[in-house]
Amino acid sequence: MMKMLTGTSAGVRLLLSPAVVRQQATITTAASRALPPTAASVILVSSRRQYATTQESSKRRSVTPFNDDGHVPWTRLSTGEKAGRAVQQTFNFGLVILGVVLTGGIAYLLFTDVFSPESKTAYFNRAVDRIRADPRCVALLSPGDPKKIAAHGEETHNKWRRARPIAATVEKDNRGVEHLKMHFHVEGPRGSGVVGLHLTKQPGHWEHEYQTFYVDVRGHQRIYLENKEAEVAAAKKGGNKEFKFLGVKWN
């Protein structure tokens, strides 16, 4: 049966159901036997295309932002389906941008706190290396084997030393000088102690400068590996008219 009859300027066009289309194709095939081969082929191809298009359109499910896999071409989407695909692609693009931003933030934090030569972790590692290389510290902590000197952060319930946080603060004074202060613990077969560091960085400079770097071992005198205040006092006492303190030359 015919579904719908519409009038056009060129004539009358019938919109047929799939059953009618198949019946029409059968009739057309029978009629085409009386036609020349070329004309019959054209009629058969046209009928099959019309049937395939009608069948495919009736079977295709509606495209939404949740089930769109990009298989249906853009030109075959309805206005609502195009809007849904645009929403899906905008959401996916936003996720990509968010991932890039988060990755960049994590990379920046890793560089500034771990991999940078001026990071807290870098100064912690260099301080431990200097303690292991100092004969005074080795004699009090691990005589004869400096490699057995271990360092860790604040005491916690976690028995894994690497998981203990290092106490460190960074602040600027009213002159714009950055102060990095850090302290951690060292242990050896013979004894244990506390390490303190104070470094400064002048405005416009990239490197920190040691102000104090000491090791306190219980029952022993403090060991200074760096003591800028003592150097300044010695310079004043020796009559040196020019000395350096906090990265600035003083007269």
UniProtKB/Swiss-Prot annotation:
Single biological process term from Gene Ontology: protein import into mitochondrial matrix
How does the protein's chain sit in the membrane according to the entry?
Answer: Single-pass membrane protein
Q: Which Gene3D superfamilies match?
A: Mitochondrial import inner membrane translocase subunit Tim21
Query: Which regions of this chain are Mitochondrial intermembrane-facing, per the record's topological domains?
Result: 112-251
* This protein's UniProt keywords: Membrane, Mitochondrion, Mitochondrion inner membrane, Protein transport, Transit peptide, Translocation, Transmembrane, Transmembrane helix, Transport
Spans through the membrane:
91-111
**Where does the transit peptide lie?**
1-51
Keyword check for Transmembrane helix: yes
Give me the Gene Ontology terms describing cellular component.
Answer: TIM23 mitochondrial import inner membrane translocase complex
Which InterPro entries did the record assign? Tim21, Tim21_IMS_sf
Name the principal localization, coarsely classed: mitochondrion
Q: What does this protein do?
A: Essential component of the TIM23 complex, a complex that mediates the translocation of transit peptide-containing proteins across the mitochondrial inner membrane. Required to keep the TOM and the TIM23 complexes in close contact. At some point, it is released from the TOM23 complex to allow protein translocation into the mitochondrial matrix.
Family that this chain belongs to: Belongs to the TIM21 family.
**Which protein is depicted?**
Mitochondrial import inner membrane translocase subunit tim21
